[in-house]
């Protein structure tokens, strides 16, 4: 089997800044679980990168899994110690780098240097939203994401897409911009968290759950408007809505609504820092998981 390398830069940043796992992070974590026993870790900054030894990689992978699977309870000095004790090296010629996070690919010297040194890059594309729906993203995100796609299309040896729609979007972008799509596969995503075994629901009565960072494209505003109308008609007997997700970008109006307890009469609850153990319980007993975007 060819040597496998995993870029875990984004996951390590999440630990340093004590962040909960996003959807992209959960995908990267799944690859760490699958390949971690034999793979080596790669870290990158502004296109410069290095690999660490197998032993150091296992320590890093263990810290990563412990942090994201144990509700964020890990001391950062353990991560720092694993990094500082790591001998840095280049990725071996003939190796395969699996890049699952988008982050860092905007610096084209990263993938270019790997290609020149006989390393195959397999790049995972999660979406093209910054290009197809730029108004829902921060200023400058479209330009960064376009650089990532151009790097992947011109210098990677393979593409993983999380859906047929994503792959079709990428193929359309490639055709419009003079690129050839490398060999590609659709790898659909499994659930990112275990459903709890608790037989008791977290709250009494029927409830619905919405999970995701609070930002315009997730359409929380639409759901809250629907719930407001139900509360106006049904009062406190309206079904409950549980919103799980941290505060994101350009969402002050949604946050103001979520904090307006008088408006909701106890029917809407917001959990900005929900651990996975609790999330599993919420999902198990919910009537439905809502995705209005």
What are these regions (language model features)?
Residues 1-293:
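Carbohydrate transferase catalytic cores enriched for Leloir-type hexosyltransferases
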């Amino acid at each position: 089997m060819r040597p496998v390398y995993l870029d875990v830069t984004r996951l390590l940043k999440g630990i340093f800044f004590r962040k909960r796992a996003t959807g992209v992070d959960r995908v990267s974590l799944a690859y760490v679980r699958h390949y971690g026993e034999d793979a080596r870790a790669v870290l990158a900054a502004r296109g410069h990168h290095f690999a660490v030894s197998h032993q150091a990689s296992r320590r890093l992978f263990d810290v990563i899994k412990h942090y994201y699977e144990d509700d964020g309870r890990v001391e950062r000095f353990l991560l720092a110690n694993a990094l500082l004790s790591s001998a840095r090296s280049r990725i071996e010629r003939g190796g395969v780098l699996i890049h699952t996070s988008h982050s860092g690919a905007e610096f084209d010297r990263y993938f270019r240097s790997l290609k020149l040194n006989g390393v195959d890059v397999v790049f995972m594309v999660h979406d093209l939203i910054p290009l197809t729906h730029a108004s829902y993203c921060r200023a400058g995100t479209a330009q960064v994401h376009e650089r990532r796609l151009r790097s992947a299309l011109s210098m990677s040896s393979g593409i993983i897409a999380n859906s047929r729609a994503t792959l079709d979007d990428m193929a359309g972008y490639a055709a419009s911009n003079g690129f050839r799509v490398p060999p590609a596969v659709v790898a659909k995503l499994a659930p990112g968290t275990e459903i709890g075994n608790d037989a008791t629901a977290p709250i009494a009565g029927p409830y619905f759950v919405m999970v995701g960072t609070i930002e315009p494209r997730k359409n929380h505003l639409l759901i809250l408007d629907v719930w407001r109308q139900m509360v106006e008609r049904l009062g406190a007997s309206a079904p409950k809505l549980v919103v799980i997700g941290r505060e994101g970008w350009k969402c002050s109006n949604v946050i103001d609504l979520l904090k307006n307890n008088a408006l909701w009469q106890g029917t809407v609850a917001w959990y900005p820092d929900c651990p996975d153990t609790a999330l599993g319980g919420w999902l198990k007993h919910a009537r439905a998981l809502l995705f209005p975007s």
